[in-house]
Amino acid sequence: MQDAITAVINSADVQGKYLDGAAMDKLKSYFASGELRVRAASVISANAATIVKEAVAKSLLYSDVTRPGGNMYTTRRYAACIRDLDYYLRYATYAMLAGDASILDERVLNGLKETYNSLGVPISSTVQAIQAIKEVTASLVGADAGKEMGVYLDYICSGLS
């Protein structure tokens, strides 16, 4: 896992250069948004269960996946879905704090799509639920922080699609 600082420094180091104006601007932007990201992460952490519950109610609860024969029909499958959505929210929060999506590739997306396809988990329903997480989160943390968090939730959706 990297953070925005490490990514900028590593890029300059590989090239054997000092940080240029563009690199400094990236660092300034990262530091300027730090308080916003920390506040958002605090709100998300305190409300994670509610965020996931509301997102499921908004996107999956009365869909085909929750009906008998659907992919979330048994209690065990439903619990696994909730667990996965909580996992995505947690890792997207880590990525937002770091200002870098690399943790999502390493810990979430690497092999996930293939695993879901082999298990018959409907990717479109998962993406729909993640989009609902994005909406619920934005309503709790505000527009600016919601936009920042949305970058990482969208990243997960893109990786699954």
From Swiss-Prot:
Pfam families associated with the record: Phycobilisome
Membrane topology: Peripheral membrane protein
GO cellular component, one term: phycobilisome
Entries under Gene3D superfamilies matching the protein: Phycocyanins (1.10.490.20)
Localisation: Cellular thylakoid membrane
Keywords, comma-separated and alphabetical: Antenna complex, Bile pigment, Chromophore, Electron transport, Membrane, Methylation, Photosynthesis, Phycobilisome, Thylakoid, Transport
GO biological processes: photosynthesis
Positions with a binding annotation for (2R,3E)-phycocyanobilin: 81
Modified sites of kind N4-methylasparagine: 71
Modification comment: Contains one covalently linked phycocyanobilin chromophore.
InterPro entries: Allophycocyanin_b, Globin-like_sf, Phycobilisome_asu/bsu, Phycobilisome_asu/bsu_sf
Role played: Light-harvesting photosynthetic bile pigment-protein from the phycobiliprotein complex. Allophycocyanin has a maximum absorption at approximately 650 nanometers.
Subunit structure: Heterodimer of an alpha and a beta chain.
Family, as annotated: Belongs to the phycobiliprotein family.
Protein name: Allophycocyanin beta chain
Species of origin: Synechocystis sp. (strain ATCC 27184 / PCC 6803 / Kazusa)
